[in-house]
Amino acid sequence: MDLAAGSSFTSIDGMRVRFVREGRGPVVVLLHGSGSSLDAFDEIAARLSPSCDVLRLDLPGFGMTGPRPDRDYRIEAYVAFLGRFLDEQSVADCTLVGNSLGGNIAWNFALSFPDRVERLVLMNATGYPGKSLPTAIRLARNPLTRPLVRRAGSRGAVARNLRGAVGPRFTVSEEMIDRVHAMTSRPGNNAAFVDFANTDQTDRTAELRGLRVPTLVLRGDGIDGQHFARDIPDCQEIVVAGVGHLMPEEAPVEVADAILGFR
């Protein structure tokens, strides 16, 4: 499994950042969730690239980009990093799409740099305090299990986490388990995940009522949508039946069609 095939790399903030850019047209930037990588968007990128300039990357702490040298996993650090990455790619503005953690980064970026975001698409995005946490993050925060998570996650644990994160209509494949396990097992990534999970984050959700970027919320029907559709002015929402937290891989056709149809 050559996961680096077709990838490019650039140096930002002391990291060798992996990214893939393909297609022509308006720029669409895809941000993955925690414990994931740009590969989660393979099918979506294939559907968007005939009419869009699709840019996706492994976020700091994940995939082939790996840990931040300064171990700073605050959302504001991700926002600053994303701005530098877009500058390096000569992207002035874009449609910004994020799943889970990627959605959290995306809406915070839109709050900080609204003139750089033409449209915002949030897939099962996070960021509201008090939300129930995924099992992997709970384990990373527990002092008793934290050392185990920091050292390594077995393939079996990865399989259990993936199967627990998807909806009833999706079957986690062996190939998906192998890919995610290969990425999370890269040197430093498990430790980076623990650092991320134990980072105190600033709550900016009160600012969402002032966001003036056109926004589309996508969520699975079994997922807590938090309050984005309520708080963001003139926000559109699409609920996809039978889909869990890993929407880019569970419903790539619906997601790609929603992005292309969002005007």
Question: How should these model regions be labeled?
Answer:
Residues 107, 111, 118-148:
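Flexible "cap/lid" loop of the alpha/beta hydrolase fold
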Residues 191-231:
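Conserved serine/cysteine hydrolase catalytic core
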Residues 155, 160, 178-204:
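Hydrophobic, aromatic-rich cap/lid helix
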Residues 233-263:
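Catalytic active-site module of serine/aspartate enzymes centered on a nucleophile-bearing elbow/loop
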Residues 77-94:
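Conserved acidic catalytic loop of the alpha/beta-hydrolase fold
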Residues 1-28, 49-52, 91-92, 260-263:
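Alpha/beta-hydrolase fold catalytic core
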Residues 98, 102, 106:
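Gly/Ala-rich beta-loop-alpha elbow adjacent to hydrolase catalytic centers
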Residues 15-64:
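Conserved HGGG/HGGXW glycine-rich cap/lid loop of the alpha/beta-hydrolase fold
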